[in-house]
Each structure stands twice: as structure tokens, then as C-alpha cells.
């Protein structure tokens, strides 16, 4: 699927009443925190050293010619034009390891990845709680190499019409086929090295942010052999879905002032409840879109501790007996 169609798909998932500026913020990977406003300019940076990153072996997107590049913004770092998917392990101290694992999918509208705020920082915090975490750097649609052209291309996409209807699950999976392939490869890799990484192959979950939440949901509903044991949707779309009888426990966090996804109802939550599957939903008064691990003066900052408490409630912070 073309970049334009992908962005329009995301726009449609956001709902007809989503403000264009909110959509632009989401597609750039985050909502600007007031304390970080001085860092809102995109600045090119060298590609960070990633010695622990493991190539997943999935092929580059067709006609992908622009090389991977990185930039800083809002005090975080972002990757663009990713053509080689990787998985980076963040393993806990063996003495603290619970056997649970989480694959972390950053957001960024499928044309950038918020690698720090929604990736590495999340993984480090999970590892500190005894959970093995793996940051998925999935393949992205190509955008112009220069940041000015990148920004211009997004503005042009946002000016286009929106799709006439919400895509069904099969269409969503087809539109994200390369990213879904990366997610499936990530689950396969973790399971293949479960003994080495002290991971219980039956306790591997996934957490996604914004676009990464979309990928998490598609992986859950159409990922075949991925089979996440538990999932978290952090400020992703809450459109209703067809929930399978064996759907995993779901954790959701969203801010009421999220201009992208807070105005379209809570269909996802209702779908999980109607199917009789476990779901926990935190709806914060303020936080905007893209709060991630940023320190903010809003209660949305508490989402991670709430998530950890949820993991504990499901027995995932204790090693499995026997």
C-alpha cells in the first residue's frame, strides 16, 4: 500500500472529527510536552550505535531506495526510512527475571519510529521489573531523505481526502503486511532463543504505541503464529473489532484530550467486554497524544505503573511455579 493510502487509513481510524493538527502530531510520533517545547525542531543526528540489534531477516519494502536516517525532536530520537527490521533485547538481571517477555512496538505513523520515548525507555523500565523486553524496529514506508521534504510530504498527505469507510480486519492486516511480517518474525526469534534469554515461550506479550498499537492489534487478530499472550494498546485507535474466543488480556491507556483517538468512542473496549475477554482501560483526563515515558505534569504519567500493576495481577511479575 502507498504511503498516501497508509496515512489516509490512519486518518480514517482516527475518526472524522479528529483535528488535522492532532493527526499531524500523531504522525510525527508524539504530542509536544510543554517542558520540551524548546526541542520541537527536527534535527538530523548520526545513526546511534545499536550493537545489540538483531536483524530479523525480513526483506526491504519494494522500491525502498532512501537510506535509514535519524533525527532528534522533543528530547527524543526517531528513525525514518527503516528498510531492515531489527529486534533489540533488553534483558533483566537473571536474579530478577520472571520469564515474562514483551515485544515493544514504537509509534510514528508507519513513516517514523519514536525509538526512545516509546521504545528503549519502555524496554529498560520493563527489564528493571524483571520482564525481558524487545524493541521492534519495524520497516517503514519511504519518505524524502531531507527533513524539510519529510515534513512537506506529511502536510500534503494530510490535505488529501479520507477513505469513505473504516477498513475491516483483513484490510488492515493487508495494509500492514510488511510490519506484520516483522512482528511475526520478532515473536519467532524470541521463542527460538527462549532458553538463552530465560523467557517462557507461553508468556510473551506485546505493547504498542499509536501506530505501534495498531500493529499490536493486527498481530493479535491476524498474526497467526505470533499468538501474544497479553497485549497493551497505548493511545491507539479504539475502533470495534471482531474478538476471537481466545483473545489475550488487553490493557489500554488513552488521554481524554488525545486529539486523534479520544473522540471516536470506545468500541475496542466494548468488543473485548462483549467477548468476555479480560480488559483494563485507563482514561486519563489530560496527557495528549504520544505521552509515552515523558515526564509530564499529568496523571497520564502513571500509565506505566498501572501497566506494571496489571502485569502483576496477571501473575506475570512472578516466575512460573514448577
Cite the ranges covered by each PLM segment.
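Short beta-strand element of the alpha/beta-hydrolase
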Residues: 99-107
